[in-house]
C-alpha cells in the first residue's frame, strides 16, 4: 500500500530496473497503478488485451512524462501473426516476441518458427527494438542475434547454471 500511495519505492529501487510483463486482461485499465510502481519497462501482451480496437489509441495517448520514465512494449505469442503488431510499432518502444507457447513455464524449448516472425518484423521495421522471451539459451540466443534481435530474456538458462554470473557474462558476449 505504501508503494501504491507513492510513500516508498519498490525494494532495491535504485539497484534493479523492474520490467512488468503484463499478461493480464486488465493491463490497460490499471496502467496508472503499474506506472506508480516505477518500472523501467512495461510490456502488454497483445493476446490478453480485451479491446484491441482501442489499444492503439491507448498507446498513442500515453503522456510524454510517462514515456520519458519508461519504455512501452507489446508482446506476441509465437503463433500470433506478426503483422498484428505492425499498426502498433509506431507507438511502442519495442516489440517482444515470445519464444515459447506455454508462457510462464521455465525450461521450455525455443520455437524455431519465431525466427521467421523476427525476420519479417525487422524487414518491415528495421529500427524497431526486438526482444525475445522464452526458450532463450546460448544456442537459441546466437540464432536470435543473427536475425537481428536486440534483447534476450532468459530465466532457466541463467538460474539453472552452476555459475550464474559466468552465464550472464556468456550471454553478454553474444
Language model segments and positions:
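Hydrophobic, well-structured mid-protein blocks that either form specific transmembrane helices
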Residues: 30-84
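Glycine-enriched alpha-helix->loop->beta-strand junction motifs that scaffold or abut catalytic
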Residues: 14-15, 35-42, 63-71, 90-100, ...
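Glycine/Thr-rich beta-alpha phosphate-binding loop at enzyme active sites
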Residues: 78, 84-125, 166-170
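Active-site beta-loop-alpha junctions enriched in small/polar residues
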Residues: 23-25, 47-49, 75-79, 98-101, ...
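Structural motif corresponding to the early beta-alpha repeats
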Residues: 1-52
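Catalytic cores of alpha/beta
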Residues: 26-36, 79-92, 136-152, 166-168
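Alpha-helix-loop-beta-strand connector modules within alpha/beta enzyme cores
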Residues: 1-20, 58-78, 112-136, 170-174
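Glycine-rich phosphate-binding active-site loops on the catalytic face of alpha/beta enzymes
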Residues: 42-51, 96-107, 147-168
Amino acid at each position: 500500500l505504501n508503494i501504491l500511495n507513492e510513500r516508498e519505492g519498490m525494494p532495491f529501487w535504485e539497484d534493479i530496473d523492474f520490467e512488468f510483463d503484463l499478461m493480464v486482461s486488465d493491463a490497460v485499465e490499471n496502467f496508472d497503478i503499474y506506472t506508480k510502481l516505477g518500472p523501467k519497462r512495461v510490456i502488454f501482451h497483445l493476446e490478453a488485451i480485451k479491446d484491441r480496437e482501442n489499444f492503439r489509441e491507448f498507446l498513442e495517448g500515453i503522456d510524454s512524462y510517462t514515456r520519458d520514465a519508461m519504455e512501452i512494449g507489446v508482446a506476441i505469442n509465437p503463433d500470433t501473426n506478426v503483422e498484428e503488431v505492425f499498426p502498433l510499432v509506431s507507438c511502442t518502444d519495442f516489440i517482444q516476441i515470445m519464444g515459447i507457447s506455454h508462457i510462464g513455464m521455465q525450461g521450455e524449448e525455443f520455437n524455431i518458427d519465431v525466427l521467421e516472425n523476427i525476420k519479417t518484423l525487422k524487414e518491415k521495421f528495421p529500427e524497431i527494438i526486438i526482444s525475445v522471451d522464452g526458450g532463450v539459451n546460448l544456442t537459441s540466443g546466437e540464432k536470435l542475434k543473427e536475425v537481428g534481435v536486440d534483447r534476450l530474456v532468459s530465466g532457466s538458462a541463467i538460474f539453472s547454471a552452476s555459475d550464474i554470473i559466468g552465464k550472464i557474462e556468456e550471454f553478454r558476449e553474444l
